[in-house]
Regions:
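Non-heme Fe(II)-dependent double-stranded beta-helix
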Residues: 1-12, 18-120, 126-129
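Short, conserved beta-strand element in jelly-roll/cupin
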Residues: 128-138
Length: 138
């Protein structure tokens, strides 16, 4: 099903796996996303990952926000099932090989009209890998 994934990934630097999750599964994950956001909002922790730098001060308001947490699978069994999904793992294997290791998961929510800017940036220096084998599954 994803035989051309590796060649497209190597040529363009990305691969869009259309139809990986059906509408019913996406609806479940959307509901879980909202539930996790509600849960972390109630935690009292600072969950605003607003960039807040000179790069963004001219393009966003001072009350902008982007709600953020790590390790989403710890908040939700549905999210855990998603990252363990056989089809997702098969696509991942076709891109980087069979020795797949989960580095981390993240959740971001930008509120309408005041979502924080998040400039393009490169994280490789924080997470160096051999043969550029770290990918993001979004």
């Amino acid at each position: 099903m994803y035989q051309d994934a590796n060649s497209k990934f190597n040529k363009g630097g990305f691969y869009l796996a259309r139809g990986l999750f059906n509408e019913k599964k996406v609806a479940v994950l959307e509901k879980e996303f909202d539930r996790v956001v509600d849960q972390i909002k109630k935690s009292g922790e600072n969950i605003n990952a607003r960039w807040g730098s000179r790069l963004t001060e001219r393009i966003e308001s001072s009350d902008s926000s982007v709600i953020h947490t790590h390790n989403v699978q710890g908040y939700s069994h549905q999210m855990l099932k998603m990252i363990q999904d056989k089809q997702l793992l098969d696509v991942t294997e076709s891109l980087i090989g069979g020795n797949i290791i989960l580095h981390h998961t993240k959740l971001f929510l930008k509120p309408p009209k005041k979502g924080s800017a998040f400039p393009l940036h490169q994280d490789w220096s924080y997470f160096p890998t051999k043969k550029n084998s770290m990918i993001a599954a979004v």
